[in-house]
Amino acid sequence: METSAPRAGSQVVATTARHSAAYRADPLRVSSRDKLTEMAASSQGNFEGNFESLDLAEFAKKQPWWRKLFGQESGPSAEKYSVATQLFIGGVTGWCTGFIFQKVGKLAATAVGGGFFLLQLANHTGYIKVDWQRVEKDMKKAKEQLKIRKSNQIPTEVRSKAEEVVSFVKKNVLVTGGFFGGFLLGMAS
């Protein structure tokens, strides 16, 4: 069944052809418009081979963690703010992190210290008997395993993450400095 309405692509080609006829005085414009007209006409329904595929999962795996968090280029995006703004952003985030770290640290220290206190109390009253010879034997075994595993070579995963962190710190010195200053203030408050 044929309809009398023309296809949308043919309307674009006809409109482009009319506009290119109006600009016959400028040969550069005519040639570029003609090329666009030809490209539009030739690509109607033919999209094979014209596109390049990009595997986003592989692309995301290759990106450093701060680019995933802050965007493609964290350096220039941070540099677009003034020095005071960068220091303020770093200081506020550092203070919040330090404050939370302090509160969680106090809670963890209280739990560990309280648990140690209760264990000592239970040991002193006789509820728990510690086999100190076995503890000493296990400690020696653990020391030997650490000596065996100890090497001067850092694993590549750790080295690559450390290089990423150093690169981020170098690109964002003001934000990083503000963060550490704010972190220390947050720990103190």
From Swiss-Prot:
The modification Phosphoserine is found at residues 10, 53, 151. GO terms for cellular component: mitochondrial outer membrane; mitochondrion; nucleus. InterPro entries: FUN14 (IPR007014). It is a multi-pass membrane protein. One of its GO terms (biological process) is regulation of platelet activation. GO terms for molecular function: phosphatidylinositol-3,4,5-trisphosphate binding. It holds the Pfam family FUN14. The chain crosses the membrane at residues 81-101, 108-128, 165-185. Keywords: Membrane, Mitochondrion, Mitochondrion outer membrane, Nucleus, Phosphoprotein, Transcription, Transcription regulation, Transmembrane, Transmembrane helix. Residues 102-107, 186-189 are mitochondrial intermembrane. Residues 1-80, 129-164 are cytoplasmic. Binds directly and specifically 1,2-Diacyl-sn-glycero-3-phospho-(1'-myo-inositol-3',4',5'-bisphosphate) (PIP3) leading to the recruitment of PIP3 to mitochondria and may play a role in the regulation of the platelet activation via AKT/GSK3B/cGMP signaling pathways. May act as transcription factor that regulates SREBP1 (isoform SREBP-1C) expression in order to modulate triglyceride (TG) homeostasis in hepatocytes. Belongs to the FUN14 family. This is FUN14 domain-containing protein 2. It comes from Homo sapiens. The gene is FUNDC2.
